[in-house]
Structure formats: structure tokens, C-alpha cells
Amino acid sequence: MEKIAIITDTTADLTEEFIKENDINVLSFRIIYKDKEYKDKVDITSEEVYRNFEIEVPKSSMPSLQDMEDLYKKLEEEGYTHAIGITLSSGLSGIFNGLKMIADEHSKIKSFIYDSKLISLGEGALVEECSKMIHNNKSFDEIVKAIPEIRKKIHLFFVVGTLDYLKKGGRIGKIAGTIGKLLNIKPIVSVDDNGVYYAYDKVRGRKQSLNRVMEIAKDITKNSKCRAYVMHGDAEKESKEFFKKVKELPNINNAFYNGCISPVSGVHSGPGLVGLVLLEE
């Protein structure tokens, strides 16, 4: 009898309720200030990160290898035979390589560690689908086979208030050099096949950038029924207005407002993020 564990990280932006109900194992990123280090979503909130920006923009690091080692020991003690890990994009972090290395050292548990090439609820949607398959008594091999196919159906787009934070954190990817700050050009950011940020499109002005994301969503939902997720980074009012419009799109089966992104994601994106994830169903 297979006993399958799911492992992910705090950037997947899953709700606490979902994590508890589905026994999801979540590895915490680290947020590092000059005088103190915090565990993402454990002892620091997104709001605290944003409010402190004027004083200090912190650095971040991936979950420690020791945290991963401790998790695998716990899973072994709890009698898990298999583990599926869904991680933040390897184009943005070393967590995929780290978790794969630790998984390979624990041969008692058969593991499949998957590089989502996504962030936030793009990654989170994959975790949710894996959890559903476990509840539907799918085998480990069936789930492993399904994951890359589900990944192909996930679309992620977001806009940010300023690119300065992505630059500071070294997460600017392929967006650099394409944006004219003085012209108020706003990129619609997505991730490419390597899981690196790039400018999917560029428009002038904040309002137009959100309208453009809506147009992109209309194109995707025109021919496919989709599940939608909306999230924000210190842009609650705008994101709620955006969510109302998303719910009215044709072919939206379910729409979820997941609130604020993880503190560590906020460190790199800065205030003003509004994001949309679509999963073709």
C-alpha cells in the first residue's frame, strides 16, 4: 500500500486551511535582515515585510538542507513510502536541486521532485492537483505521469509596482533592458520554459497593464474552461477589483482570491503586485 507525501515550499502561496486539511509538507524560505533571520510565513508576515521596506529591504535564502533532511526523517518515521515534491522554479531558486539531493539520499522513500518552473499559485495549483489525485486513490506512478501534462495547462501573469525590487534581488530575468522607466512602460511578467521571468508584453501605465492581463485571460478562456487564482503583493484594493472582473470571464469554472503572496515573494517583487493564474481544466 502506497503512502504518498506531498512536499512544497512557502512560495506556492497555499492557504493554511488547505495545508492542514491535506497534510502538505511546506518548506520555509528564509528572510534575512541585518540583525535577524526569519522563517517565511512562520515568524514573519507579508505585511511586516512591506511595512519595513523603507527601513531595510531584506535578503532571502532557500530552505536549509537541514530542514529538508529533517523533513525526510519525519516522513520515514511516519511510514511514508513515496514523496512528490513540487518546488519553486529552478530559474529563481536552488530549492529544486537541494531537495532532489536530499531525496536521493533517502532511498527508503521513492521520490519524484518536480521543478514547477513557476512561482506562487502556479506552483500551488500543481500541488492542489497532486493532492486531489492522492485523494482519488491514484498511484504514485499515475501522479508522476500526470504532473508534466498539468503543468502545460497552467498560465501565470503578473504586474508589479516597480521593477526595482526584482533588480535588487537578482530576479529580473529577461525583463531587463526592455522597459523605459521614464515612459511609464509596464511589463506583463510571466515565466518562460526555463522558469525565468520575462516580459510577455509591455504597455504604458498601470491601468492599461491590468487591462492587458484581462485581455490575455480572455484569449485563454475563450476556448478552454479554466480555474482562476488571483493574488497580490500589498495591492489589496486593486486585486479585489481585478478579481471581480476575472470571475465574470467566460469559461471560468472556479475563481479563488488567495490574498497576499508569501513574505519572501514580496521581498523580490515589492509592493504593487497583482497576479493571475489560470489552470485549463
From Swiss-Prot:
Molecular functions (GO terms): lipid binding
Gene3D superfamilies listed in its UniProt record: 3.30.1180.10, 3.40.50.10170
KW Isomerase (keyword) present: no
PROSITE patterns membership: DEGV
Keywords from the named record: Lipid-binding
A Pfam family hit: DegV
Record domain DegV: where: 4-280
Binding positions (hexadecanoate): 60, 93
Function: May bind long-chain fatty acids, such as palmitate, and may play a role in lipid transport or fatty acid metabolism.
NCBIfam families per the UniProt record, alphabetical: DegV
Protein's name in the database: DegV domain-containing protein CA_C0948
